C-alpha cells in the first residue's frame, strides 16, 4: 500500500503543532510558577557563625532588602517583623526599581513606619535607589529609618546590657557612591581596643574594598540569591556581576558576609530561589 505524500506532510505538520502546543503549555506553566514563587515570601531564621561579632551574643537583627517596588510583599514583611520582635531592623537598599514610576510613596512610608515601630531601624542605599535618591531618602526618613550613607551610628541594645557597637552604612558600589574612608576606622587604629562593627553594604562585592578597615560582619543584598537557580547547576542563571556569594553566610578572610535573597525581583520572576526576610541571631 502506497502512502500519499500529502498524508505524510499532514502527519509531520500535526506533530509540529503538538510539539509547539506542548512548548507553549510548559512555558505558560513555568511562567505561572515563577510568578507564584516570586510572591511567596519566606521568613527565615539564621544563626551567625560562632564568634563572628564578639560581645554581641543574643543580638537579633531583622534583615530586609531589594523590595523593588513590590508593596504587597513589603506589607507581608512588615507583618512578619511585628511577629518576630527583633532588637533592630536593617534595610539594605533597592526600595524601588529605577525604571518603574512610583506615585504612591505614602503607602511605602506607612509600611516603613510599621517596621520602625517594631525596633530601631537603619538603612543603606542600593544601585536602583540612586536615580530616585531624594524620593527614597524621604520615604526612609518619614518611615522612621536612620539612613546611613557612608556614615556610621553607635548602637546599644538595652536587652543586651547596652553594650555599644558600630553600625556602618556604605553607599552603593556599582553607582560609585562607596566611600568607607568617611565612616570606618583603619585596621591599625583599632587593634588594641576593637569595637564590634557591623557593615551594611547593598552589594556584597564591597567586601573586597575593605581590606584596610576593621569590621566583623557585613550584611548585603543585591544578588536576589541569583533569582533563577536551575537544578544541578551550582551557579544561578542570573548571578550578579560574577558574584560567588549569592545567599546565606560566607566566610571572608577572618570575617563573615551574609547575603539575603531579598524581597522583590526584576524580570520574569523567581525559580528555586524564593524571596525572604531574615532574622539573624548572633550566638
Map each language-model feature to its residues:
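N-terminal membrane-anchoring alpha-helices
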Residues: 1-55
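N-terminal short leaders/motifs
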Residues: 2-17, 94-101, 203-214
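Conserved catalytic scaffold of divalent metal-dependent phosphoesterases
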Residues: 52, 97, 129-217, 240-283
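Structural motif
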Residues: 61-63, 90-92, 122, 167-169, ...
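His/Asp/Glu-enriched short active-site or ligand-binding loop at hydrolase and phosphoryl-transfer sites
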Residues: 225-230
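Short, surface-exposed loop/helix-turn segments at secondary-structure junctions
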Residues: 231-243
Amino acid at each position: 500500500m502506497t502512502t500519499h505524500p500529502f498524508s505524510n506532510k499532514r502527519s509531520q505538520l500535526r506533530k509540529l503543532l503538538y510539539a509547539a502546543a506542548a512548548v507553549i503549555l510548559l512555558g505558560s506553566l513555568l511562567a505561572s510558577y515563577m510568578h507564584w514563587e516570586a510572591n511567596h515570601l519566606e521568613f527565615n531564621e539564621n544563626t551567625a557563625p560562632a564568634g563572628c561579632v564578639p560581645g554581641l551574643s543574643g543580638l537579633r537583627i531583622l534583615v530586609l532588602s531589594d523590595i523593588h517596588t513590590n508593596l504587597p510583599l513589603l506589607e507581608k514583611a512588615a507583618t512578619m517583623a511585628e511577629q518576630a520582635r527583633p532588637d533592630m531592623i536593617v534595610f539594605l537598599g533597592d526600595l524601588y526599581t529605577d525604571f518603574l514610576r512610583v506615585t504612591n510613596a505614602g503607602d511605602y512610608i506607612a509600611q516603613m513606619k510599621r517596621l520602625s515601630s517594631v525596633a530601631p531601624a537603619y538603612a543603606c542605599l542600593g544601585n536602583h535607589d540612586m536615580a530616585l535618591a531624594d524620593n527614597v531618602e524621604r520615604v526612609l526618613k518619614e518611615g522612621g529609618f536612620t539612613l546611613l550613607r557612608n556614615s556610621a551610628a553607635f548602637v546599644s541594645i538595652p536587652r543586651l546590657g547596652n553594650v555599644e557597637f558600630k553600625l556602618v552604612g556604605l553607599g552603593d558600589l556599582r553607582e560609585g557612591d562607596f566611600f568607607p574612608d568617611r565612616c570606618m576606622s583603619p585596621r591599625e587604629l583599632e587593634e588594641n581596643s576593637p569595637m564590634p562593627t557591623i557593615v551594611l553594604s547593598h552589594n556584597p562585592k564591597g567586601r573586597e574594598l575593605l581590606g584596610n578597615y576593621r569590621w566583623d560582619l557585613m550584611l548585603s543584598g543585591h544578588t536576589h540569591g541569583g533569582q533563577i537557580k536551575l537544578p544541578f547547576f551550582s551557579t544561578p542563571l542570573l548571578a550578579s556581576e560574577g558574584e560567588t556569594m549569592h545567599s546565606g553566610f560566607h566566610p571572608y578572610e577572618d570575617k563573615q558576609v551574609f547575603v539575603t535573597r531579598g524581597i522583590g525581583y526584576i524580570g520574569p520572576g523567581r525559580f528555586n530561589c524564593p524571596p525572604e526576610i531574615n532574622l539573624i541571631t548572633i550566638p
